[in-house]
Amino acid sequence: MGRCTALHEEHLALGARMTEFSGWELPLHYGSQIAEHHAVRRAAGMFDVSHLGVVDVEGLQAAPFLRRVLANDVARLAEPGRMLYGCMLNQDGGIVDDLVVGFIDDRRFRLILNAGTREKDLSWLHRQAAPFSVTVTPRDDLAMIALQGPDSPRIADAVVAAGSSGLKPFTATQRGDRFIARTGYTGEDGFEIILPHAEAGSLWRQLFQAGARPCGLGARDTLRLEAGMRLYGQDMDETVTPLACGLGWTVAWEPEERDFIGRAALERERIGGSPSKFVGLILEEPGILRSGQKVAVANVGEGVVTSGGFSPTLRRSIGLARVPAATGRECRVEIRGSLKRATVVKPRFVRRSTSLIDIC
């Protein structure tokens, strides 16, 4: 059995089917993964995401430190409350982790790390922090709840904090003990609330009473897949650069003198051109796309499905894949020994309950 979050008893009381994920005991679903998925697309759902790593970086050199360790640039955060998404890279440009950073004040930032890389990330951050006047503090005293879906602003105003709906996307505010961010991992509008363990159960029950449906990891994965959001360990890892997984937009190349870790390797890749590109796939024959399946592109080469599954919104099998740069609009995917036709599209399928399918 993995570690339990502060909401473990709440999940059991609601009849959750539990599973282990990245060393944590978390809900897979509460009876119907499909119904939970649709609840987020059509109304509101809530997730226990307390397994994510919350880390505070503080000190006189907090900003210079993060400008060194992140490919994106926290100097872009013009005022407290702004947030950005980016990657920490190794010297070869490979992704150590993808994360969200919040600017609290000139001496304090908050990082949200992936659960599976938490200990590795902390070790790496501590090593990189040695030349800087900063502290890196994991906040193991905090829980985290994601409220997602078109009804989430109404529920947040009523339950989380009055005026929550006034937050702009990728901004955050501190209301008492609650750190409230207009962020998420579903492709829908929503909030992520970080708060003390002792308060988590009460907020969870209030959200439930206000109409938010409890959702598990299963729905979280199909929602993020439809939205084209990457999953660390599947869509990228330390052997994959941001340019090779469609995250080149998270790299801040200016100013040129900012020497972030991995910059030299990325510069070489940018000049020479990446041999691969990151795409979406729609399966045109019976079957289900799954991570690890081979992608065959006639007269070009081979690629690999990095994430795949059934889309409850589109009612089709979709996937994300890394394929040769010269790949056109069609390919075939090897499923149980047979090559199945697939259409190549841009790597996002659904946002705000709307189909975004766009042929490459």
Swiss-Prot record:
Coiled coil: none
Disulphides: none
This protein's UniProt keywords: Aminotransferase, Transferase
GO biological process: glycine decarboxylation via glycine cleavage system
A Pfam cross-reference name: GCV_T_C
Enzyme Commission number(s): 2.1.2.10
Gene3D superfamilies per UniProt: Aminomethyltransferase beta-barrel domains, Aminomethyltransferase fragment, Probable tRNA modification gtpase trme, domain 1
Position of the signal peptide: none
Molecular function per GO: aminomethyltransferase activity; transaminase activity
Name of this protein: Aminomethyltransferase
Species of provenance: Methylococcus capsulatus (strain ATCC 33009 / NCIMB 11132 / Bath)
